[in-house]
Amino acid sequence: MSLFETDSWSAAVFTGRWTPAAGGDAPVVSPATGAEIGRAGSANAEDISAAAERAAAAQRGWADTSFEERAAVLRRAGALLEENGDEIMAWLRRESGAAPGMAGFQVHVAAAECYEAAALASQPYGEVLRTGKPRLSFARQVPAGVVGVIAPFNAPLILSTRSVAPALAVGNAVLLKPDPRTAVCGGAVLAEVFRRAGVPEGVFQMLPGGIEAGEQLVADPNVRVISFTGSSAVGRKVGEAAGRYLKRVHLELGGNSPLVILDDVDLDAAVSTGAWGSFLHQGQICMTAGRHLVHERIADEYVEKLAAKADALPVGDPDRDEVALGPLIDAGQRDKVHSMVTTSVDAGAKLVAGGTYEELFYRPTVLDRVTMDAPAYADEVFGPVAPVMRVSSVDDIADIAKASPYGLSLGILTANPMRGMEIADRIPSGIVHINDQTVDDEAVAPFGGVGDSGTGSRFGGTRANIEAFTETQWVTMQADVARYPF
């Protein structure tokens, strides 16, 4: 059975049922072809406000549902994602430009997020406390209420599910606002999956929209927690707005992650790892290896081999061809990437591969001898670009790596893992991989960054998800009513 066996989702938002949005609708466009491949609802502030009211009304009943029933719903959601994997992967290829491997990975991880969330529903949420009075004293975790999720375009299925599933598991209602550029993969798919899985009406709602919808979601008094994944620039604005309303906000933001290649490494393995870390999904991943810090003894050979690999990677429409890289999401992103490459070359970097494009298809690019002030090194590119900086010592590596304001992921490649850990201890980062590249994700592992990469929030794993989507409540209980001196 097709996930979208009817066109009821077309030009609609999901409020527990598919319905037109007060804000109208918008086209769903394939970045590979430029063709309109569907239409999605486009929520405005009125839509968000009404949805938040419905969510607040529905949340208490969902929280009162037994943990077994919530877990069963999430297990069914995971199974539906797997059963409809081929159809979902086709949408990921067409709508987000994901190559087949990346599309399959998203389905796998999204299903895993649902299964892990199902297990979360039965976890103990509290602890018994010591008390100096004749009473029972304990702390417990209670649902936050209504959680607003703002998800990006780049890995839309994973980055929506990562917040939606655990928030539902612990008894919250959820409003999901996917990026309008990936309203199907990041929104409609999950709406239909959770509808079929049995989430009650009003508990999960999906409303694509632009700035107006996002601002209302952050401001609405019925929404108590915001989970935002996106750029650091927008994340700052979301954090500032949430602060005005004393609202909890989880910010998973950009990265400019360093990949350190030491001189004792297996060079061919390092080149394979570096290419994957920088070019996977056209570099449109927050954890992408954005800076290659290569020991000067092996730098010439590393750059030569990395450039050869970049030149050999096929680029094209992932829905029609066997390709390693698909298109960038839109012309604005392509122009930003190309500007950062050309200005870095003007600043002294050497272009050794790529640096060209046709339409939205950008060739994997290698820049050698970049400096710390080159745009492609200093900031997040979010494109298939591997800037290489040559380093001469461990002190250089640590100083250069931690000079960036970002701190999401760190990869260190070396024949001596303990040497790698010693370096890692000197570089602030939310994630560290010794002898692997910077891009990885597992539903059981905490995920998040420091500095400009986020608020240190974590997604994944029991403790992180409970902390993210519940509030701590202190409770005391005694047999008789207390008496006082007056």
For each of these PLM feature ranges, what is it?
Residues P31, A45-I48, F67, G85, ...:
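Residues at or immediately preceding the N-termini of alpha-helices
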Residues T33-R39, V223, V260, P314, ...:
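Conserved C-terminal structural/oligomerization subdomain of aldehyde/semialdehyde dehydrogenase
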Residues G126-A269, V391:
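Rossmann-like NAD(P) dinucleotide-binding subdomain of oxidoreductase/dehydrogenase enzymes
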Residues Q59, A63, G78-G85, M89, ...:
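Structural signal for hydrophobic packing residues in well-ordered secondary-structure cores
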Residues A233-T371, D395, I434, V481-P485:
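ALDH superfamily catalytic-core signature
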